[in-house]
Regions:
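Short, charged helix-capping/linker segments at alpha-helix termini
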Residues: 24-25, 137-144
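N-terminal intrinsically disordered/low-complexity leader segments
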Residues: 1-5, 188-190
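Short, basic, alpha-helical segments at the C-terminal edge of helix-turn-helix-like DNA-binding modules
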Residues: 58-64
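Helix-loop "lid/cap" segments that line or gate small-molecule binding pockets
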Residues: 83-90, 99-109, 179, 183
């Protein structure tokens, strides 16, 4: 296995362990066990657990951004985007669990690197939503505000679904889609 492949294996193992145990409860030994390697080898690739955390976040962010690279507001509709985000909760709830773990760590790291990471995650999320919305809403300030609202809705609805399997996320997203489409229609007529 190449050095790059081994590094990726460790990042994938760390992602799984951090999601299951939380960053603070996870150890290098846990990550090494998940990756089926010795703990000493983890330190060959990563200086410490925090460096591994940052590498996991970078990998998660890159994977997410690749989904939307090249999409403009005209190439993907709001219902398609909302459907993809809703189904992510069902298909990959660990993606959101990871997100909440990073949020929790960042909130406690006032002025530190993790707080900046959370700010970057949220900013990237807003931008990835605002850019295509600007094609539909016309007013860039409104597109950015709508992106912030949608991001809060996505995270909040996902949290409700993860902690309560009976939560009707389908109905909530149906209504959210109708609200977004109505807002776009109204803003288009201005």
């Amino acid at each position: 296995m190449s050095k790059k492949d081994k590094r990726k294996q460790l990042i994938d193992a760390a992602y799984k362990v951090f999601v299951e145990k939380g960053y603070l409860n996870a150890s290098i030994k846990d990550i090494a066990n998940e990756a089926s390697i010795t703990p000493g080898l983890v330190h060959y690739y990563f200086k410490n657990k925090e460096e591994l955390l940052h590498s996991v976040q970078e990998e998660v962010q890159n994977r997410y951004q690749k989904q939307y690279d090249g999409h403009t507001g005209e190439s993907i509709s709001p219902p398609e985007v909302l459907h993809e985000i809703k189904t992510r909760v069902e298909k990959d709830p660990d993606w959101y669990r990871w997100r909440y773990e990073i949020y929790s760590l960042g909130i406690k790291d006032k002025g530190g690197h993790l707080e900046n990471q959370v700010d970057s995650i949220l900013n990237n999320g807003r931008e990835s939503l605002a850019n295509p919305l600007q094609q539909m809403v016309k007013n860039s300030l409104d597109a950015k505000a709508l992106a912030s609202i949608l991001l809060a809705c996505f995270d909040g609805l996902a949290l409700q679904k993860i902690v309560n399997d009976q939560f009707d996320i389908d109905h909530s997203y149906k209504l959210l889609t109708e609200l977004v489409e109505l807002y776009i229609k109204i803003s288009d007529s201005d």
